[in-house]
Amino acid sequence: MVDQVKVVADDQAPAEQSLRRNLTNRHIQLIAIGGAIGTGLFMGSGKTISLAGPSIIFVYMIIGFMLFFVMRAMGELLLSNLEYKSFSDFASDLLGPWAGYFTGWTYWFCWVVTGMADVVAITAYAQFWFPGLSDWVASLSVIILLLVLNLATVKMFGEMEFWFAMIKIVAIVSLIVVGLVMVAMHFQSPTGVEASFAHLWNDGGWFPKGLSGFFAGFQIAVFAFVGIELVGTTAAETKDPEKSLPRAINSIPIRIIMFYVFSLIVIMSVTPWSSVVPEKSPFVELFVLVGLPAAASVINFVVLTSAASSANSGVFSTSRMLFGLAQEGVAPKAFAKLSKRAVPAKGLTFSCICLLGGVVMLYVNPSVIGAFTMITTVSAILFMFVWTIILCSYLVYRKQRPHLHEKSIYKMPLGKLMCWVCMAFFVFVLVLLTLEDDTRQALLVTPLWFIALGLGWLFIGKKRAAELRK
């Protein structure tokens, strides 16, 4: 794959079918931060808090710890060969063409499914202000807007993600500061609840639902981290990947502590975990509970922006994956063509059309949170597959190309050991998904995707990939 796709610097005249390196360090850092603050944090944290109580803090820390090492593996691999434009490329190079095919199409499907969840979330957030608003109106408006803006240039995507991420950062930092002030002032809500850190351990301790509740929090919590690997799809369009990628990946632990741990501590200090409504976003409900409806509208705008940001990332990454797959000969040739602005326009349009499946999902499952849970479970499973492929690629890389590892400027710490630890953790999460009815249904449906992919590779992909290599 890496021989088929070329990238050029911004100041060079682009050859036909070449991606341009238009994303600066500023874009990459904010894309990484925005990817780490997903819809799952805003939309799914209500359910995870109700399932696990304060122990959900440890759930997010554990998942974040594991994914940091997955990202370190991805970073070392991408920088070992700057012709790699994404993890689909090194999977194809190290594991074989089948791996690039499965990874590329699965990642495309991951983001389409995630985009559907974002459409569901956007619909819910829009109904906060307009209870009678049609699901179709809210969804179509956002999808058309994202399509139009992404058709412009890759730099436009970078700018959109920059400002989307800035809104999320300002909102979460503001929430943390306001929450800390409330705790310091012993603020009392209209219901008589006094803000206090003691809520974290006084109402049943750190593990009020026991180990079963603690384990139940992992499914939606995993979904909150999807998109953390997004910087890996920008490698071919980054001006200085050797500096930008390590900086973005190394900041992951700080982002997790700041945006996940601190925000959840504040939420459960102001609003006792037992009072959190699983069907609603606790970020919005926190301000409603303390009698600040105007602030609740602002936060609702922020979480709506977060969902739009996630959908924006999905539209970007899926179009790039389709472009790479088409270059490999395992996707329709039309997706391999770029517009005059070096944007894979046909891939963008196709992915946006697929996002409308989120609206269909709402009609199949009228419960917003029910539809969100089903979609996010499928997404979490597929993302774990992609993360596992990254780890497997790293193990093969260490075995077959030890000289590249020795020369690497960005070695993964505890490389081989942590690969196995992370994969064991993903198996553990899959086992947990069998415990709940709604997640079990999604777990049973997911293999159908891999069966369809396998048949596609057997009858079409394998032959086309071989012809292209000749």
Curated annotation (Swiss-Prot):
PROSITE patterns: AMINO_ACID_PERMEASE_1. Disruption phenotype: Single deletion, grows on D-serine or D-serine plus glycerol but not D-alanine. A double dsdX-cycA deletion grows in D-serine plus glycerol, but not D-serine or D-alanine alone, growth on D-serine (but not D-alanine) is restored by dsdX. Mutant exhibits increased resistance to D-cycloserine when grown in a minimal medium, but no change in D-cycloserine sensitivity compared to its parental strain when grown in a complex medium or human urine. It comes from the Bacteria. One of its GO terms (cellular component) is plasma membrane. It is found in: Cell inner membrane. One of its GO terms (biological process) is amino acid transport. One of its GO terms (molecular function) is symporter activity. E.coli CFT073, a uropathogenic strain (UPEC), was originally isolated from urine, which has a high concentration of D-serine. D-serine is toxic to bacteria. The abililty to take up D-serine coupled with the activity of D-serine dehydratase (dsdA) may allow use of this amino acid as a carbon source in a sugar-poor environment. NCBIfam families: PRK11049.1 (NF008272). This is D-serine/D-alanine/glycine transporter. It comes from Escherichia coli O6:H1 (strain CFT073 / ATCC 700928 / UPEC). The lineage of its organism: Bacteria, Pseudomonadati, Pseudomonadota, Gammaproteobacteria, Enterobacterales. The gene is cycA.
